[in-house]
Amino acid sequence: MVHAVIPENRDQYRDALLQMHRDRKTIFVDRLHWAVPVVDGEFEIDQFDTEQAVYLLALDPRSHRHLGSVRLLPTLHPHLLGDVFPDLCAAGVPRDAGTWEITRLCTTPGLEKAEARAVLGLIATALVEFALLYGVYRYTCVAHLQWLSQLIAVGWDTEPLGAPQQIDDELVGALSINVTPATLQM
């Protein structure tokens, strides 16, 4: 089951959020070698993990263990694309109340491939449901070209925001994803 962690219920998910930050450190720092902040040697927490951030957490229904997650940021507040990678957008960074950014999508290290795919599917559905419930009509994201290709392959209505650029020996691009009720059927 996927839980939407919003400012009003964040205290109820304290343990799950710590697990998420621990898993993010394992994936993004230990495996992918990203130069991002690490708190207390075990938690990947950056400047965008603020009160405005919303987290969609896939949790094991019995143990409530973190299985996967994504961070959502309203683009009217500081966010990765707008504050770190604005050059990835040819016509400027999209910023409005109905545009949110997807960042830090991950699954728990050690999941079998089939289970990780299932968790990502649950998170994808939750992204669309969250958008429809909260008036989000567009998501933006920054990702390595391989991830962007996988997002496009899902069949969602996507648009590149600019040409991919070489950043730290990787091709990185920005993408927008238009969300409508029909997106749930994809």
Locate the predicted segments by residue:
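Short amphipathic alpha-helix that is part of the acyltransferase structural core
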Residues: 1-44, 57-62, 66
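Short, solvent-exposed loop/turn elements at beta->coil junctions and helix N-caps
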Residues: 40-47, 162-165
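A short helix-loop-beta-strand connector motif used in the catalytic cores of GNAT acetyltransferases and
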Residues: 47-57, 80
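Short connector loops at helix/strand junctions that flank enzyme active sites
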Residues: 51-53, 67, 95-100
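Short, hydrophobic/aromatic-rich beta-strand segments within well-structured domains
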Residues: 56-58, 71, 127-128, 140
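Short, His- and charge-rich active-site/binding loops that engage polyanionic ligands
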Residues: 59-92
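Acyl-donor binding region in acyl/amide transferases
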Residues: 80, 86-172, 177-181
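C-terminal catalytic domain of photolyase/cryptochrome flavoproteins
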Residues: 182-186
